């Protein structure tokens, strides 16, 4: 299984990744974890360093893996990166959630979980999702408002076709 799951912040990527780790034998990796490893155990806060130096190293190493389901936020993979991934047999899976629901989740996280307010970035993330979908590199779009079990089934279904 070789897959890239791309979702906007707040779309449930980490929840789905945790579900896969707890309920399947599928090898799972997350961009944030890999960036943290490369940055001496601290999540990189310097956006330029993260995107220009660390993320390309993560992507290069990841594209050579034989069996992995890789969860990532938007904007790390360029269209060329995604095309290379497809050429190497990766399926590109997109988690989709509307702006209204993303804003609700954002408000809840800010108020109840102490997260930073991501509202100013959400529209740009949605545009990235549309761009890669319109470029034809996405194999399947999954409604991120479904249950984690259903999302897991949909993702796994991509690999049995």
Where do the protein language model's features map onto the residues?
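Hydrophobic anchor at the beta1->P-loop junction of P-loop NTPases
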Residues: 5
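P-loop (Walker A) phosphate-binding loop of NTP-binding proteins
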Residues: 8
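ATP-binding Walker
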Residues: 11
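Walker A/P-loop
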Residues: 14
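Conserved substrate/cofactor phosphate-moiety recognition/catalytic segment
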Residues: 18-63
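Glycine-rich phosphate-binding loop used to anchor ATP phosphates in small-molecule kinases
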Residues: 49-91
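Conserved phosphate-donor/acceptor-positioning beta-strand/loop module used by diverse small-molecule
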Residues: 86-106
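Small-molecule kinase domains that catalyze NTP-dependent phosphoryl transfer to phosphate-bearing small molecules
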Residues: 112-154
């Amino acid at each position: 299984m070789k897959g890239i799951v791309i979702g906007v912040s707040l779309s449930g990527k980490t929840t789905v990744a945790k579900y896969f780790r707890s309920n399947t034998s599928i090898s799972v990796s997350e961009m944030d974890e890999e960036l943290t490893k490369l940055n001496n155990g601290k999540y990189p806060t310097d956006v330029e360093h993260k995107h220009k130096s660390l993320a390309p190293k993560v992507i290069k190493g990841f594209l050579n893996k034989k069996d992995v389901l890789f969860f990532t936020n938007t904007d790390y993979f360029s269209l060329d990166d995604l095309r290379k991934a497809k050429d190497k047999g990766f399926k590109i899976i997109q988690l989709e959630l509307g702006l209204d629901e993303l804003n609700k989740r954002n408000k809840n996280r800010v108020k109840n979980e102490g997260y930073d307010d991501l509202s100013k970035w959400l529209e740009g993330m949605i545009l990235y999702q549309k761009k890669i979908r319109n470029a034809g590199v996405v194999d399947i779009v999954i409604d991120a408002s479904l249950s984690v079990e259903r999302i897991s089934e949909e993702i796994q279904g991509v690999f049995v076709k």
